[in-house]
A protein has these predicted regions:
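Helical "lid/coupling" subdomains associated with nucleotide-phosphate turnover
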Residues: 1-200
């Protein structure tokens, strides 16, 4: 959580300041029921590049998984594991890009200036991830790294350096409820249960 106000000179905030705690839900991107949403939000070429599979094979597997939503990678299913890695990475990238703010460049009498739309999350120090595709893989840290700033998207205000914690037991929702009455207890449980899975 962060107020996300501009942190650099010559940057103005566009619109109203957002709340300290902000929640977004990306219902159009998911690993099975909304699997086509990931492709729509990025493109099949990105899925192919990250998975190492051909675009045609990615399309075939994605169509199959959209119907057979209970299928998960088995130990010997390298194709499906590679596809899930790509889909989870892109889902996180899209979700955090939408959640974070971004800069727009414009010219003023003072020279190049910037307009900030949304929250500046570049200084956020911790990212917590959860979900089956992140819990049941050995590549959690690699997938979670897609939540962080990418120099190729220079105007994004995603976190630049953040410790990645994994909620492997799906406790976050319960801790949110618990924290309304017992905040210290909820914090203590989260500190114990959230697992460090890479420092980027």
């Amino acid at each position: 959580m962060s107020f996300g106000l501009p942190t650099t000179g010559m940057t103005a905030l566009k619109g109203l300041r957002e709340e300290y705690a902000k929640r977004t839900v990306e219902g159009d991107i998911g690993m099975r029921y909304s699997i086509h949403g990931i492709v729509d939000a990025t493109d099949i070429a990105h899925v192919s590049e990250l998975s190492g599979l051909s675009e045609q094979r990615c399309k075939e597997l994605i169509d199959y998984l959209s119907v057979h939503t209970d299928v998960v990678p088995k130990d010997d299913d390298d194709e499906l594991e590679a596809l899930d890695y790509a889909l989870a990475s892109l889902a996180i990238e899209v979700a955090v890009t939408r959640h974070a703010g971004h800069l727009e460049q414009y010219y003023s009498p003072m020279g190049i200036s910037y307009m900030q739309i949304g929250k500046d999350l570049t200084a956020v120090k911790t990212v917590i991830v959860t979900g089956g595709a992140l819990i049941h893989t050995k590549r959690t840290a690699q997938i979670a790294s897609h939540a962080l700033f990418n120099p190729l998207d220079a105007f994004s205000l995603k976190p630049k350096e953040a410790q990645v914690l994994v909620d492997r037991k799906y406790i976050l929702a319960a801790m949110g409820i618990l924290s309304t009455e017992y905040p210290q207890t909820a914090l203590r449980i989260m500190k114990k249960e959230l697992v460090k899975d890479g420092n980027h």
